[in-house]
């Protein structure tokens, strides 16, 4: 059996885009930093997002059934740090300017690209929930380089 630490160390060697995944609802705005995001289908346009079930904001994503994947530009390392830290959700969102599209989920105004999504399916696998998300709107910026982990 592969040890969890060995798996995490090996996965850290894979280059991937850095994303801030956000949601909003009656209980407020929440978000987390994620690299486990990928395209599933172009028809219908669908993304896959993985989230640790132990995350304090996990329940809000489940209840809201919406999210936005905000792909960070190379100058937005501070947002990656903020959304992976222990600071409050309110403080996290003060670090940048946000807007909304179709779902009402927070969209980072100067992200490389943002995908506004409705969560259509949730699969539980090990420590994580896998959200299968239908994209309902896309916002692209003029940024040229993405932040890579």
Predicted regions: what they are:
Residues 1-149:
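Basic, polyanion-binding surface patches
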């Amino acid at each position: 059996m592969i040890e969890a630490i060995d798996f995490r160390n090996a996965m850290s060697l894979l280059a991937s885009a850095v994303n801030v995944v956000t949601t909003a609802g009656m209980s407020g705005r929440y978000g987390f930093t994620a690299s486990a995001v990928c395209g599933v289908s172009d028809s219908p346009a669908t993304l896959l997002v993985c989230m640790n079930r132990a995350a304090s904001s996990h329940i809000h994503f489940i209840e809201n059934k919406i999210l936005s994947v905000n792909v960070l530009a190379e100058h937005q390392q501070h947002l990656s740090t903020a959304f992976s830290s222990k600071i409050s959700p309110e403080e996290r969102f003060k670090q940048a300017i946000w807007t909304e599209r179709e779902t009402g989920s927070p969209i980072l105004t100067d992200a490389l690209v943002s995908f506004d999504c409705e969560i259509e399916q949730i699969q539980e696998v090990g420590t994580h929930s896998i959200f299968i998300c239908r994209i309902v709107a896309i916002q692209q910026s003029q940024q040229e380089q993405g932040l890579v982990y």
